[in-house]
């Protein structure tokens, strides 16, 4: 580790460290990004990915009114649902609170998590998600996004290579917007080192 420590950001090392010693070397780092189909967003007056939560809701309302499905999410693979929910929790409660929950220092049973789950439920009730998504795999949802069926697709940045290879120049990646700026901020993301 001493030979390579300057090339490995400390933020990547948490998953390979135990009891003060390093037992692995992460080779990649991925985050959950909010991929946007800019061609579909332009149809409802958005030339940039919505930067605030209010803008995202406005954009989604306009997409639904135009008959465009805002989000695709695989319900068949629950980790995909988790990527949405964790992002909403983080943008509501903040990264520190979410990390405390993951580490067992705090409970899932708290007001911020309840608020985030309520926001997610409201998005479902407002028909922001493909109603057929519950029966789709992630690969099917990703293919639908690539075919222009959804305005947004939240998933890992490992998808960037596939989108570039397919020549999808209409795709732009951002992050889910902050919901509670007193607890969260841009740049606090779900994800981390892997491999």
Where would I find each of the regions flagged by the language model?
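Hinge/lid segment of periplasmic solute-binding proteins
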Residues: 1-33, 57, 83-84, 111-112, ...
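Short, solvent-exposed loop/beta-turn-alpha elements that line the ligand-binding surface or hinge
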Residues: 1-8, 92-115, 165, 178-189
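Extracytoplasmic "Venus flytrap"/periplasmic binding protein-like
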Residues: 1-11, 15-17, 39-51, 143-144, ...
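Extracytoplasmic/periplasmic substrate-recognition and gating elements
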Residues: 42-44, 126, 165-195
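A local structural motif
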Residues: 44-48, 121-135, 149, 166-170
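Short helix-initiation/N-cap motifs at beta->coil->alpha
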Residues: 51-57, 132-146
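Glycine-centered hinge/linker elements that transmit conformational signals in sensory
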Residues: 60-62, 102-134
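Beta->alpha turn/N-cap motifs
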Residues: 138, 155-160, 177
